[in-house]
């Protein structure tokens, strides 16, 4: 072995010795966050928020190519493109209170209205000014709050976006059960297949009706069993823009109205304790 080879071996041995003595330093993300003034609870909260925003939720195809997100499951991410329009459709009957966008300079959001049989539907028209943008949007309505992420892509975009609501699924299931059980409800005298269940119920009172249906002459409003023995809410039928009282009677937890109603309001309490529930024929 010549002198040069001996020197190379010695240099290699010294390098290995130094590597063994000096420990490998791994930067803990929590240490980095602490250095930025973020507490452990704040870091945990940001991690949970990131997990919710980045989770893969249910996305399905609706009518006319609409992309359907399940409301409340995850933060939906809507992809738009410059020179194109993204149409985000909210639930029929919702009233928009406020729209907040993180980047108001490069994103434009304009509300539009569409008439429905039972009211109107709000459409949010979203347009980015350039590709490669990411921001967030919060939409507050009369029923709920939407947290939506907006992204812009050079060419790809979602033309129509909508939502499926868990409470709607519950309502549809209740309607199915109502059809199966209606023939056993006293007082109707009409086969289940001849009853109309096309009513929507909006409101969050504790006595909120579980279902509403009509036999063509009378309207039946069924409340939770817990209302039995308690003061029932007062029923007002909306006609010509005014509320008027019609004849009705209570049978246990069932309100029987001697009228085929299209729109009505149930009211309980006064002042700040007042609770209201709206009943509408033909959906929201």
From Swiss-Prot:
Pfam families, sorted: CagX (PF03524)
Position of the signal peptide: 1-34
Gene3D superfamilies: 2.60.40.2500
NAD recorded as keyword: no
Entries under InterPro entries matching the protein: Conjugal_tfr_TrbG/VirB9/CagX, TrbG_Ti, VirB9/CagX/TrbG_C, VirB9/CagX/TrbG_C_sf
Keyword annotations: Conjugation, Plasmid, Signal
Protein's UniProt keywords contain Signal: yes
NCBIfam families tied to this protein: PRK13839.1, TrbG_Ti
Family label: Belongs to the TrbG/VirB9 family.
Name the record gives this protein: Conjugal transfer protein TrbG
